[in-house]
Amino acid sequence: MKLVEIFTDGSCLGNPGKGGIGIVLRYNGHEKQVSKGYLQTTNNRMELRAVIEALAMLKEPCQVQLNSDSQYMKDGITKWIFSWKKNNWKTANGKPVKNKELWIALDQEIQRHKIEWTWVKGHSGHRENEICDELAKAGANNPTLEDIGYNAD
């Protein structure tokens, strides 16, 4: 299996508001950077979407070192999702899981890969996280895409 390093970040100008994702993907000494902007969304949706988009870029199953400053995303996919699926996508207190369709998409993307999840402290000088932050902000400042599934309720 190829070893791929992925760094992601999501940004939102206002919450909700215009949002963006930033991705740095590194394989075999090569680095690819991605920035996309969304017209109306939330910060958590952007954190999730960044990881989904990054994993979708991989053409074959890989060993992935995935780095994100989103504790929400990391805890959701490594801890909470198992209970959510058992409880028909309800939280521990019986409420519907927010961003359900993105969690389902992320759960589908991770099935192909062997992933090591790492939380990175945001805004702390971590090179790739800072790059992702800039890419996400650039996307949020120039949004062109609709965040399908976003519901303001």
Swiss-Prot record:
Gene3D superfamilies linked: Ribonuclease H-like superfamily/Ribonuclease H
Chief place where the protein resides: cytoplasm
Subcellular location: Cytoplasm
Listed EC numbers: 3.1.26.4
Domain RNase H type-1: 1-141
Record-linked InterPro entries: RNase_H (IPR050092), RNaseH-like_sf (IPR012337), RNaseH_domain (IPR002156), RNaseH_sf (IPR036397), RNaseHI (IPR022892)
SUPFAM superfamilies in alphabetical order: Ribonuclease H-like (SSF53098)
Keywords, ordered alphabetically: Cytoplasm, Endonuclease, Hydrolase, Magnesium, Metal-binding, Nuclease
Top-rank taxon: Bacteria
Enzyme class label: hydrolase
GO molecular function terms noted in the UniProt entry: magnesium ion binding; nucleic acid binding; RNA-DNA hybrid ribonuclease activity
Reactions performed catalytically: Endonucleolytic cleavage to 5'-phosphomonoester
Swiss-Prot/TrEMBL GO biological process terms: DNA replication, removal of RNA primer
Binding annotation for Mg(2+) 1: 9, 47, 69
Comment on bound cofactor: Binds 1 Mg(2+) ion per subunit. May bind a second metal ion at a regulatory site, or after substrate binding.
Subunit-structure text: Monomer.
Family indicated by similarity: Belongs to the RNase H family.
Physiological role: Endonuclease that specifically degrades the RNA of RNA-DNA hybrids.
NCBIfam families: PRK00203.1
Protein name: Ribonuclease H
